[in-house]
Amino acid sequence: MLKVLVVDDEMLARDELKYLLERTKEVEIIGEADCVEDALEELMKNKPDIVFLDIQLSDDNGFEIANILKKMKNPPAIVFATAYDQYALQAFEVDALDYILKPFDEERIVQTLKKYKKQKQSQIEMKQEIKGADVTAEMHKLALPIEESIVLVNIEDIVYVGLVDGKVTVKTVRETYVTHDTLVILEKKLPQASFMRVHRSFIANINHITEIQPWFNSTYNLIMKEGSKVPVSRTYAKELKKLLRI
């Protein structure tokens, strides 16, 4: 259940919003407030996931609360729930999750909750990717799922990763592996300081490049230390030149 705080100086508006939120069966109303002072007290006490916040309050406006929330380490999501449409840009500037107008619509509120859950899932996935990349960098090895086992490969020995004959292939100085990982997954696992996508089907270790040969139509071939050729498409040629300062 999502924990929600409702802040509005009009009791009828609070009651309507609470009713619609509770109808979704996805939230728990953990508090309500009609002014900035009470809202901040509820925030510190209950730590909600989402704050539904009116802009015009009896003692100030909702942006005062939003600016305080923005400075918190793990702030709740802010949803402005207001009768005024002219503050949408200002809401964007304080990183509001959403901006909904009175009179409230149940379908619109459901959409807001879906948006929140999607955002949280994206944050979780990003943290997992960063954690995985950090572990890979610390180990200096890449874990490759190969058939029914996992092979640990020295990252510095990887020459390129590419789609060869329809299979995702990892070419090292001594071995060639076919893996169950996708190119997208491998690109996230490999350190960006050494590996660069040079083609929609290839990621190259720039430390293994010995020569760049012009090909046709502004494309290139990379000649790697152990003799492999890796294609560079026009899409990625400019970035490669920039990286290598050529």
Curated annotation (Swiss-Prot):
Residue ranges constituting the Response regulatory domain according to the UniProt record: 3-117
Subcellular locations according to the entry: Cytoplasm
Key word Cytoplasm present: yes
GO molecular function terms attached to this record: DNA binding; phosphorelay response regulator activity
Cellular compartments per GO CC: cytoplasm
PTM info: Phosphorylated by LytS.
Pfam families assigned to the protein according to its UniProt record, in alphabetical order: LytTR (PF04397), Response_reg (PF00072)
Domain HTH LytTR-type: 142-246
PROSITE patterns, alphabetized: HTH_LYTTR (PS50930), RESPONSE_REGULATORY (PS50110)
KW Protease (keyword) present: no
Residues recorded as bearing 4-aspartylphosphate in the entry: D54
Keywords annotated in UniProt: Cytoplasm, DNA-binding, Phosphoprotein, Transcription, Transcription regulation, Two-component regulatory system
Organism domain of life: Bacteria
Function: Member of the two-component regulatory system LytS/LytT that probably regulates genes involved in cell wall metabolism.
Identification of the protein by name: Sensory transduction protein LytT
Source organism: Bacillus anthracis
